[in-house]
Amino acid sequence: MTPSLSTLVSVGRSLARWVSGRPAPPSGSDDPQALDTLRRAREAREAGRDEEARTLYRFLLQRWPGHAEALRGLRDFAIEAGDWDDAVGLQQRLLTAAPPADRPIESEWLAVGYYELGRLELARADPSAAVAHFRAALRADREFLPGVLALGDALEAAGDHREAVRTWERAAETRPMLPLLARLERVYRREHRPGRMIALYRAACERVPDDLGLAAALGRVYFELEMLDEAAEQFEKLEVRVPDSPVVHAFLGAIFERRGQTRDAFDEYRRALRLGHAFDWPHRCAACGTTAPTWQDRCAQCHRWNTLRPSSPTR
C-alpha cells in the first residue's frame, strides 16, 4: 500500500477513536516542563533553527501526545517540505487532540492535506487515486471549494464525465461561486446548450443577489452569445451599483463597439483603462486582504487555501 493510500485508510480509524469518546491524550498544557520546551521551540523556529525546533516538538509529543502546538509545528514543517502524507497524519492527530472550538479550522487543514495528495496523484496521471483523496477532503470539510472543483476534474480525467457534472451541479445548488459555475459553463458551452448557460447564472444571481461577480458573469454570457441588449441592460444595472468598476466599463465598451457606436465605445474603454482595465472579476483574500485578478485555490501572499472571495473591482 502506498503511503498516501495508507494515510487515507487511517483517517477512518482516527475519526472513529474521536467519535468513540475516548479521553484525549495528555496535552501538557499546564506542565512547567512542557511550557518551557514549547518556549524554546518557538524561539528556535523564529531564529531559523528548524532542526532544533523539530527536535523539541518531537520531544513534546513523546511526553505529551496530545500537545496541539507541537502537532501544528510539525505539520507546518511537513507542509513546507511538501510531505503531505506526514502532514495529513499529523493533522488527523491534531483533530483528535483539539478542543471542540478548534475542530472546524482543523478540519479545514485536513481537507487541505487530502486536496494536495489528490493533486499529486493527478500529476502522476492516476485520477482514480486522486478522486479518493478529493472525496476525503470534502468529507473533512464539505465547504472546501478547491476540493469540489478538483473532484470534478479528476472524475473527468477518469472518464466519468456524468458524475463530474453532477458533482459540480450539486455543489452549485447551495454554493453558486464563480469558479464552480465556470466549470459548468464550460460543459454547457461544449454541449451547445446556451439556454443552460443563461439559466445557470440567472439562478445563481437570484440565490445570491449581492454577489456582483455573478451579475457580471451573467452579463458576460449574454455578450458572448451576442445578446447585446440583454448584456447592455445587465451591465448598466451593475454600473449603478459599482460606477467605478473597470470590468463594467470594459464590457460596455465592447458592447458599444459591437453595435458600431464607436464614440460611446471609446468613452467606456477610456474609463476602463483609467480605472484599471480588466474583463475578469477580481478576488480578495479573506485572510490577508490581498487582491488577485481571478480566483485561485491558494492566496499568493499568505499562502492560505480557499480564502479568495469576489471583491468590488474598484480602486
Where would I find each of the regions flagged by the language model?
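Flexible helix-coil transition and linker loops at the boundaries of alpha-helical arrays
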Residues: 25-28, 97-108
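Alpha-helical segment of the N-proximal tetratricopeptide repeat
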Residues: 24-63, 79-83, 113-125, 129
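TPR alpha-solenoid repeat register
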Residues: 70, 104-106, 113, 147, ...
